[in-house]
Design a protein with these regions (language model features):
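Hydrophobic pocket-lining residues within nucleotide cofactor-binding pockets
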Residues: 52, 88, 115, 138-141
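Active-site segment of metal-dependent pyrophosphate-handling enzymes
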Residues: 72-119
Length: 157
């Protein structure tokens, strides 16, 4: 179920949001990070992810995130290759508007997916979540602005 902006605002003000984040690893064990355009976490590098919509099964949520954020998809028969990294909580002082009028609370299921298990989507999607992507590994510059919540994932990989 898709919520209009006012309904979503009411949910964010009054309850935690269930979400999924995707740690996508290439064959060199580097993780895909995107520089966030939207609040919260704007301007930080973060993994692809998004909220779970009411009535949306996990497979379809992951598929939607993959298609809309990186233009990839996973076949249903390959879904069993995805592994759960863990369940995390994210607390932000601001919200998707970028103001401090109300905070955000996310309960996040974090999954690990190997790039080789994905295929390029036939439909080109315009990404409105990230404006730059990198393949990151621990040896890269400390000057990258990686979000602390994302660093928690990196520590568990």
């Amino acid at each position: 179920m898709y919520l209009d902006e006012k309904s979503f605002e009411n949910v964010v003000k009054n309850s935690p949001i269930a979400a999924i984040d995707l740690c996508i690893l290439n064959e060199s064990k580097e993780i895909l990070l995107g520089k966030r355009i939207n609040h919260p976490a704007r301007s930080f590098f973060f993994v692809p992810g998004g909220r779970i919509r009411k009535g949306e099964k996990l497979f379809f949520c992951i598929q939607r995130i993959l298609k809309s954020e990186i233009n990839y998809e996973i076949l249903e028969e390959d879904f069993s290759k995805i592994s759960l990294l863990g369940v995390f909580q994210h607390f932000y002082d601001n919200n998707f508007y970028g103001n401090n009028l109300f905070s955000s609370h996310y309960v996040v299921l974090v999954y690990v997916i190997k790039l080789k298990d994905l295929k390029k989507s036939k439909i080109g999607i315009i990404n409105d979540q990230h404006d730059e992507y990198i393949w990151y590994n621990d040896s890269q510059s400390e000057n990258l602005l990686i979000h602390p919540y994302c660093k928690e994932y990196l520590d568990k990989l």
